[in-house]
Amino acid sequence: MRYPKIGIRPVIDGRWGGVRESLENQTCEMAKIAAKLISENLKYPDGTPVQCVIGCTTIGGGAEAARVAEQFQMENVVATLSVTACWCYGTETFDMDPNTIKAVWGFNGTERPGAVYLAAVMAAHAQRGLPAFSIYGHDVQDAKDTTIPADVLEKILRFARGAVAVGWMTNKAYVNIGAVAMGIAGSFCDPDVLQKYFGIRAEWVDEVEILRRIAIGIYDPEEYEKALQWVKANCREGFDKNLGKDLPEVITKSKIIPAEKDWEFIVKMTLIIRDILFGNSRLDELGWHEEALGHNAVAGGFQGQRQWTDLSLIHISEPTRPEPIS
C-alpha cells in the first residue's frame, strides 16, 4: 500500500560564510526528532506506524525548497512540518504546494529568533492564501536542548493525526448501502459535502445486493464457517420480547428468515458488507472478479432502506453456488 506520509522540512538561514554552516546540525536534529516523535506515537488505521520523509536538504532558499517539494511529490507526502531554530527567508523557504497540509514549528531558543521566522512565515502563508498551523513552545529552551516540550509535542501530534486522517481518506469513498430511509432528510448523503470538504467520493449500493450475494453464495465459504463458529462460541442471545405474542400476519409473513437461521444470515451479511466496502481478493480466486474489487471505502453507512426485506428469497439461507463466468 502507498501510505500517506508527512514530510519534514528542515528550514535554515540561507546565508553562507559561517551562519548557515553553524545551524546545519541543530536544524537537522530538529527534523529527526520530529519525525521520530510522529512515527513512534501515531499509526495508520491498519496498525502500521505513520511514515515521515525528511527533506533531502536543508532549505535555505527557493531552489532547495523546490528540490524538497519534488522529493515529497514522489513519496506521497500529504502534509509538511517545517522546522527551524533560526531566522530564514520567509517566502523563499515556505511550502507553497497548495495540495499539502502545512505546519511550522519555530524553536523557542535562547540564541536565535525562531519566533521571528515563525511570525514572518505565518504572515506569508496568510498573504498567499496557504493556511498553516503555528507551533511554538511556551518555555524558552537552551540552544543545545534537543527535547520536545510537552506543549510542542501535543501540537505536533495533533497536527499529524489530522493530516494523516485527511491523507488516508483522500480519493476513497463513503459507501451508502441503501437509500433515504422513510423520507428522513438526516439519512441523505450529500455528495457535494463529501467531495468538496472531505475529498472523498459518494457511492451507493442497493441493499438487494446483500440478498443477491447471500442467495448465490458470493462470499468466502471458509471465512463464513470460521466466523459462524466464533459467533456461536462468543455471542449470547437475549430474550425474545415477541415470544408468545399473537402478531398480525403482515408481520409474521415478513419474517422470511427462520429464527434458528438468524445468526447464519447475520454473519453472511457482515462479511458481505465488509467485502462491499473494502473488497476481498478471495472472491477474485472464486471467480467473482467485480465483487472482489470492493468500493475503496474509508467508511460506509447502512441507510435503513425499509423495504429491503420485502424481497422474499425462499432459499436465502441455503445458497446455491452456480459456476461463475470466467
Region spans (language model):
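Glycine/Thr-rich phosphate-binding loops of Rossmann-like dinucleotide-binding domains
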Residues: 90, 310, 325
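Single conserved hydrophobic/aromatic residue that forms the stacking wall/gate
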Residues: 314-326
